[in-house]
Amino acid sequence: MPRPLSATIHTSALANNLAVARRYAPKSKIWAVVKANAYGHGLARVFPGLRATDGFGLLDLEEAVKLRELGWAGPILLLEGFFRPTDIDVIDRYSLTTALHSDEQLRMLEMARLSKPVNIQLKMNTGMNRLGYTPEKFRAAWERARAAQGVGQITLMTHFSDADGDRGVDYQVQAFERGAQGIAGARSLANSAATLWHPATHFDWVRPGIIMYGASPSGVTAAIEGTGLQPAMTLASELIAVQTLSEGHTVGYGSSFKARGSMRIGVVACGYADGYPRVAPEGTPVIVDGVRTRVVGRVSMDMLTVDLTPVPTANVGSRVELWGTSLPIDDVAQACGTIGYELMCAVAPRVPVRAE
């Protein structure tokens, strides 16, 4: 019999979150970002909930091909572009749109033998300093791309570094406007945070990622209260044992937790080999039988332990929610010093996942 740990992907939540993005950016088309196997949710599992999008954004050619095999005939954007000339053959065969951020990529595209022009999103580096042409070099890149026989429609794009923070987006928008001055074409600037909080950046296409999965771009649950976003993943397990401790008794490796009095603890079938963060400290929230309580002791490879004081009726078989519809993933991530993105992507292959 399998362990009681499993993840559930909520198709209705995905559809709801896409609708939320449309409500925030009603005049823009949407690239629903499904990179990293849909942020750990599974590309095939999220497709039914997100198929009302205008396009999908991802990184891997294999995932792009999989989307085509699932029946998606609309636009697919390769957010990092391509890496070698043979990639362009796949782009051509499957009618993909690609980001283009360097002279090396442009040179490969100029030399490619294509059956039809490739639509590109020409990327400007407005301050993130990862990919793209600087504003000063952008026009020359655009003119070269426009002259290339293998290039079709050109959309202008950039990516924000601080749309969820205090610095905001104004300095990058100004850089973008400077570099794109006088250049015609659709624009794509807004990520999840900008989709929610910076409407002036919406333009023609927005690129929501984390909000498709119901989590906060800032990593703070309160920041998305009132948006209508819903968690798209629930990670749940059960208590597989209950121990009663006396004062001074310890729990787990390193004896890091010591009982201050008589108490019951529950042992949960979930550990760091399942993707739960080993660094989760005492106090990390968890839900047992619908009641919020806390992790105590170190997280082990296959198990973790929780305080049952607030849940006196809990016993073996009691349901445990590690994160999901009753416990925002950002609350868990914040306690662990990380972000919900990482927890989503870290769910291990050995965890059974189903969509509903």
From Swiss-Prot:
It is an enzyme of class 5 (isomerase). Pathway: Amino-acid biosynthesis; D-alanine biosynthesis; D-alanine from L-alanine: step 1/1. Substrate binds at residues 130, 301. SUPFAM superfamilies: Alanine racemase C-terminal domain-like (SSF50621), PLP-binding barrel (SSF51419). GO terms for cellular component: cytosol. Its EC number is 5.1.1.1. It comes from the Bacteria. Keywords: Isomerase, Pyridoxal phosphate. The modification N6-(pyridoxal phosphate)lysine is found at residue 35. It catalyses: L-alanine = D-alanine. GO terms for molecular function: alanine racemase activity; pyridoxal phosphate binding. The active site is at residues 35, 253. PROSITE patterns: ALANINE_RACEMASE. Pfam families: Ala_racemase_C (PF00842), Ala_racemase_N (PF01168). Its cofactor is pyridoxal 5'-phosphate. GO terms for biological process: D-alanine biosynthetic process. Catalyzes the interconversion of L-alanine and D-alanine. May also act on other amino acids. Belongs to the alanine racemase family. This is Alanine racemase. It comes from Paraburkholderia phytofirmans (strain DSM 17436 / LMG 22146 / PsJN) (Burkholderia phytofirmans). The gene is alr.
